[in-house]
């Protein structure tokens, strides 16, 4: 797929998203990270590379609101297995709501 929308929950500093965004400039990549320091580090890398198709937002998964965006892929590498039950339930809820049909 050459054009897609990708959401990563628990993206840290963008180690997955940034290389994909560089490789797929017609796609959109959004990362959500709880740690303000990790999110800021990722944003700094995105800005240094001039990637207009990638963004990282500092937020708690439990507080995410539906902004109308839909995603072809949702990545939860590590986060799902390391999180408490309420976060895992929220990840499933978000995935079912935000995945493109």
Which residue stretches match the model-derived regions?
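Residues lining the SAM
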Residues: 76-80
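Conserved class I S-adenosyl-L-methionine
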Residues: 2-12
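A short acidic, Gly/Pro-enriched loop at the edge of an enzyme's catalytic core
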Residues: 65-74
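Conserved SAM-binding loop of SAM-dependent methyltransferases across substrates and taxa
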Residues: 13-26
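Conserved SAM-binding strand-loop segment of SAM-dependent methyltransferases
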Residues: 50-61
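Conserved SAM-binding loop
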Residues: 42
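A short glycine-rich, Lys/Arg-flanked "PGG" loop and its adjoining helix->strand segment in the class I
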Residues: 89-101
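Conserved SAM/SAH-binding beta-strand->alpha-helix loop
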Residues: 35
């Amino acid at each position: 797929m050459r054009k897609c929308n990708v959401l990563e929950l628990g993206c840290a500093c963008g180690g997955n998203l940034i290389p994909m965004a560089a490789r797929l400039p017609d796609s959109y990549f959004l990362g959500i990270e709880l740690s303000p320091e990790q999110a800021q580090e990722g944003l700094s890398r995105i800005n240094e590379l001039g990637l207009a198709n990638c963004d990282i937002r500092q937020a708690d998964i439990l507080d995410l609101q539906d902004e109308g965006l839909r995603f072809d892929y949702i990545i939860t590498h590590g986060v799902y297995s390391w999180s408490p039950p309420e976060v895992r339930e929220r990840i499933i809820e978000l995935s079912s709501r935000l995945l493109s049909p």
